[in-house]
Amino acid sequence: MTLTIIGTGSMGMAIAHGLKERYTLEFVARDLSKLETIKNEYQANIYPLENFDITNKNIILAVKPYALESVGKQLKGRANTLYSVLAGSSLDALNTHIATQSSVRIMPNVSAKFKASTSVMTGDEHKRAEAEEIFSAIGDTFWVGSEKEIDIATAIAGSGPALLTLVAEAMMDGLVKEGMKRPDATGITNSLFKGFAPLIASNHPALIKDSVMSPGGTTAAAYAMLEEGAVRSSFIKAVGEAFKVTQK
């Protein structure tokens, strides 16, 4: 299968990097100089956006959400399937601006580059198996039953990596504050996140916490400080705020 990626920003290229070993890719964008660079790197066909014919193509739309209308005006023909990774852009909006036989919304994240994305999706049910096959090439996939659910999931699936960078940076800064060299603080924190992934995949967060929290110990003291600073509440509110933005 050939997949046509429209949009060559960070998300589009992260997805492309994850898919390149399994699919034939072609790229469409406004920036012709960037397209030439991509052509050399991926040995792929490239096309300017203006008047690009999407007839019978399987499209991965990875432009900025605000550009949906203007990009749609540049395209002609009717796509076979439109896979959109535009946060907050509804299926109705997509189908209004881009002619397609079928459409699926996906919310991946930039970890797609490392085949470790969390991709939440919804759309035409008959395209579910195909969508899961394509996006399983870049990580885990989760099909949900409504657009509201994918908008909620955006707060974690899409924005989650940025939220976790706050945690990672704060941990690094804490180690440096207490006297550790920055490279060591960075390496230790990175290793912690690497080891935590398989741990959280097979254990409930509360069980992990309880297993390492000793009475009067270091973990209990640190955890109490986070609760005092309303970190848990702030994260819950952050998810809510991200969801609100998708509804605008």
Label for each model-derived stretch:
Residues 2, 24-26, 81, 102, ...:
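Residues at the starts of beta-strands that form the adenosine-phosphate
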Residues 154-162, 209:
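A short glycine-threonine-serine/GTX helix/turn-capping micro-motif
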Residues 187-190, 194-248:
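NAD(P)-dependent Rossmann-like dehydrogenase/reductase catalytic/cofactor-binding core
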